[in-house]
Swiss-Prot record:
This is Transcription elongation factor GreA. Necessary for efficient RNA polymerase transcription elongation past template-encoded arresting sites. The arresting sites in DNA have the property of trapping a certain fraction of elongating RNA polymerases that pass through, resulting in locked ternary complexes. Cleavage of the nascent transcript by cleavage factors such as GreA or GreB allows the resumption of elongation from the new 3'terminus. GreA releases sequences of 2 to 3 nucleotides. Belongs to the GreA/GreB family. Disulfide bonds: none annotated. One of its GO terms (molecular function) is DNA binding. One of its GO terms (biological process) is DNA-templated transcription elongation. It comes from Nitratiruptor sp. (strain SB155-2). InterPro entries: GreA/GreB_C_sf (IPR036953), Tscrpt_elong_fac_GreA (IPR006359), Tscrpt_elong_fac_GreA/B (IPR028624), Tscrpt_elong_fac_GreA/B_C (IPR001437), Tscrpt_elong_fac_GreA/B_fam (IPR023459), Tscrpt_elong_fac_GreA/B_N (IPR022691), Tscrpt_elong_fac_GreA/B_N_sf (IPR036805). Residues 12-73 form a coiled coil. The keyword Amino-acid biosynthesis does not apply.
Amino acid sequence: MEQKEPMTQYGYEKIQKEFEALKEERPKVVEEIERAKEHGDLRENAEYHAAKERLAFIDARLTELSDLLARAQVIDPSKLPHDKVGFGSTVKLLDIEEEEEIEYTIVGSTESNPEHGLISYNTPLARQLIGKEEGDEITVKLPKGEIDFEVLEVYYKPIKFEE
């Protein structure tokens, strides 16, 4: 059975827009390939090779986006409980060793933007946080080593996505 891909309405619309834009671009790239073929020797035809590469990228990305859209599970996080960490929850953490507070919101993989505090539900940190409550402690293995966190607060706030 296909695994559903949780995302907000924003994430779904973002994927849909990219899908539509690529579907629109594809025939233009096919035309570029045909025009480039008219220039003769394809072995040394940079336009031809660039257009072929672009077409391969578009086709692969269309397949990927089509799969994502088919598996999309659009979730409205404002309608979910946030007494425990879950999809759409904002969680305030304390890095116990550094005594530093950080805040993350759990979102879909296509919506993640760690620089803006949005982490995918399938990252190592998010996977360990899901189901935790205020006061719980976790140890997360990250590339820079193990880090101990305490969950200070779990709540919902409207998600602000940055383009």
